A protein has these predicted regions:
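Amphipathic, Lys/Arg-enriched alpha-helical patches that create a basic surface
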Residues: 3-33, 71-91, 130-175
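Peripheral peptide segments
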Residues: 37, 42-44, 48, 122-135, ...
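Histidine-centered, metal-coordinating catalytic motifs and their short helical/loop contexts
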Residues: 102-125
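Generic structural signal of hydrophobic/aromatic residues within well-ordered alpha-helices
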Residues: 36-39, 53, 111, 159-166
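Short, contiguous, well-structured surface segments enriched in hydrophobic/aromatic residues
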Residues: 29-99, 103
Length: 175
């Protein structure tokens, strides 16, 4: 993978988060559900695999939960997918030590493992030896072992900051 290709994956991930946000803004508008149902009913040429979709769209509580999860999953997906690609690129270009020296590297690594394994912290021996790890005012420590990650522990704003820090590192600090 080239640096240009890796930065392309970062851009695609950022666009995924942005598009998800734009979708949530649209769903927050009171008339969006009516507009969607009218448009959807006229679109005969597209598959409609979710017959219960209008019911979901009219259920305020279910929509709130679904929208929150959609936004969360866009952030998790970006950070979960980019970590191994970033690490692989740095390893293949002889810059892994530079990556590991970043103040957010171990934090991201442990957070990514949480994302990839049921959204719970299940620290392995190596991770336990590194704890506590802190980055940007957020600390992951041994007391979190076996517990789920919550938005209160690491907000979407912090996830975006982590994403932007890693993207800036690839853009500016590696060859």
């Amino acid at each position: 993978m080239t640096k240009t290709e890796l930065l392309g994956v970062y851009r695609t991930s950022a666009n995924h988060i942005r598009l998800t946000y734009a979708s949530l803004v649209l769903w927050a508008y009171p008339d969006t559900t009516d507009f969607f149902e009218e448009l959807y009913s006229r679109m005969d040429s597209i598959p409609k695999p979710f017959v219960d979709l209008p019911t979901l769209l009219r259920d305020d509580r279910a929509m709130r939960v679904a929208c929150e999860e959609l936004y969360e999953s866009a952030h998790r997906s970006a950070l979960n997918g980019l970590f191994p690609l970033t690490k692989l690129y740095c390893q293949e270009t002889g810059q892994l030590d530079k990556l590991k020296a970043q103040p957010w590297f171990q934090f991201w690594r442990i957070l990514r493992n949480c994302f990839a394994h049921d959204m719970r912290f299940n620290f392995n021996r190596d991770e336990k030896s590194l704890l506590p790890v802190s980055w940007s005012g957020v600390t992951i420590d041994i007391s979190m072992n076996g517990k789920p990650l919550t938005n209160g522990q690491c907000s979407r704003e912090k996830l975006r900051e982590l994403f932007e820090s890693a993207q800036s590192f690839i853009t500016n600090d590696v060859a």
